Design a protein with these regions (language model features):
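An exposed, glycine/acidic-rich loop-and-rim segment of catalytic or binding clefts
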Residues: 29-269
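Charged/polar low-complexity intrinsically disordered segments
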Residues: 13-14
Length: 269
């Protein structure tokens, strides 16, 4: 399947497999050394840093079922998702980081972060809105990717944790930031559900000027659990109820065609 994607412009996947293997080796410590405060073994002091007069920190979410999620307000990055298997043994099902320095200096800068203002690629970093052309920051070959080089994944968000299962992040993106028009106020919530063990992500955004926005999370999952040695994702089963897909060109921009998935590596039905 991976051969169907051009590799030169997949900025967030460049050298990913080498990066993931090295990261998994460090995650053994995180996965198997729980502390009194959290199952992942993460140390709050390792995530406390002053960046441009704003403080980063570690936040632990817990629900009534014992599920636990660790996040930081730098890029709203998810650091671990600890879930029990059928025998009650906990495992982390996302790749993550064990310090704020690792988050900031990661060779995969989008790992588990909130993406904005606009997820995915914008061709040549340009778009026209109501007759006005806007030029965005270029960071992926000829294109703008995931909001630009200093998108939401690099920002320190304001944070409040109103209850153990919920954390709310806020960030105001100034008019013209990375080339996008309008002051954009964003609220992003992580919430653990008690009955379903679901991690719910909610986004809200308001603006004072016509603009575009496309928020998402760039999670890297391995539902077999992250450990050392780690199982691969090859035994994970993926189902996508789609009969068609959109092909991309040599710089990963949609060609405008809509093709059938039948008989292609894109068929996950």
């Amino acid at each position: 399947m991976f051969s169907t994607f051009p590799s030169n412009y997949l900025g967030e996947q460049k050298n990913f497999f080498l990066f993931a293997r090295n990261l998994i080796n460090t995650m053994d410590m995180i996965n198997t050394t729980p502390t009194e405060s959290n199952l992942s073994g993460l140390n709050q002091k390792d995530f406390q840093k002053d960046i441009n007069n704003k403080k980063t920190d570690l936040f632990i979410l817990k629900n009534a079922q014992g599920m636990e999620v660790a996040v930081t307000n730098y890029g709203c990055a998810i650091l671990s998702i600890m879930v029990p298997d059928k025998n009650g043994k906990y495992a982390n099902v996302v790749l993550g980081h064990d310090s704020i320095e690792h988050v900031i200096n990661s060779p995969e800068p989008f790992l588990n972060t909130t993406i904005g203002r606009y997820g995915n690629r914008i061709a040549k970093g340009k778009f026209t809105l109501y007759g006005e052309e806007h030029q965005l920051a270029i960071n992926n070959g000829p294109n703008s990717l995931h909001g630009g080089p200093t998108g939401f994944h690099t920002r320190v968000w304001d944070a409040v944790q109103p209850e153990p299962s919920t954390v709310i992040f806020n960030y105001t993106s100034a008019d013209g930031e990375e080339g996008f028009p309008g002051n954009l106020e964003v609220e992003m919530t992580y919430r653990l559900e008690d009955e379903t063990n679901a991690l719910v992500i909610e986004y809200r955004a308001t603006t004072d000027k016509a603009t575009i926005v496309n928020l998402t999370n760039h999670g890297f999952f391995n539902l077999a659990g992250i450990a050392n040695p780690s199982p691969t994702v090859l035994n994970n089963i993926v189902t996508i109820n789609a009969d068609f897909y959109v092909p991309i060109d040599e710089v990963s921009i949609p060609t405008g065609e809509i093709l059938k998935v039948e008989g292609t590596p894109m068929d996950f039905r």
